[in-house]
Amino acid sequence: MNIKALEPLAGDRNFPDWNTDINISAGENVALDRWQEFQSNGLDSYDENRNFAGIDGTSRLSAHLRWGEIHPRTLLAKLGDSKAHDVFRKEIAWREFYADVLHHNPHTTWDYYAPRFKEMRYDEPDSKFNAWCEGKTGYPFVDAAMRQLVQTGWMHNRTRMVVASFLVKDLHLEWQHGARFFGQHLIDFDVASNSHGWQWTAGCGTDASPYYRVFNPIEQGKRFDAEGDYIRKYVPELTHLSAAEIHEPWLYLDGYSNGYAERVVDHAAERIESLARLSEIKADKPLDPRV
């Protein structure tokens, strides 16, 4: 079975009237200033802070790298031997690795690196996909991330994985739908990093996260936004909830008092469904495309 992903039409989405805050300075001097700031205030703790969505724990250099305002070698030249520096070095290597993979496999821009996953059963985009685009899935950590993307043109790397997993494994949609949406909004959009980052999470890429690894959007929020500050910033409907309440508003009487969206799916049930679909193609890991 060869399933072709359809590009979602912008007219099918009903975005709220959010205020857009895309105001990013550009140029080599800006990139070098940001790199200097990160070296002084974030690099040495990168390994500890890089996954927390609500803090400034990453370099925020992705757009500068994408548009050629700073070279990866400029970053590598300043790195030492500490664990934090080594973790940052590996993240730069991921970017270069994906560029090489796409160079040798150009079809993987929109096609599967592991072709077996074409055979999996997928659903067609519907109102649940629209809810994902709009940040109205009913899962606060997912919704905060999607609203951050639309409002700012950027999304934290941790939440990119979380929302990708939600689209592929909770909504059972092909990864290309999400990859195209990212391409419409990311200021740092890089074809290789985007397509293969999505395929990594979807389980069909190079050295991919196993498909059976399904990110729990509730636990991810509790772990990487424990106090809920990131959620409150982008989901004002939940600002009245405490840290203990904000990740599962459906459990509390006033969780929906400000009009927050109800859950479009039940994560526990969809996780089971996702694994059942995997068993149908009998592929618990991606296959080498040369086979």
Residue ranges and their predicted role:
Residues 56-237, 243:
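Active-site-proximal binding-pocket segments
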Residues 1-116, 224-291:
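Glycine/tryptophan-enriched, flexible segments
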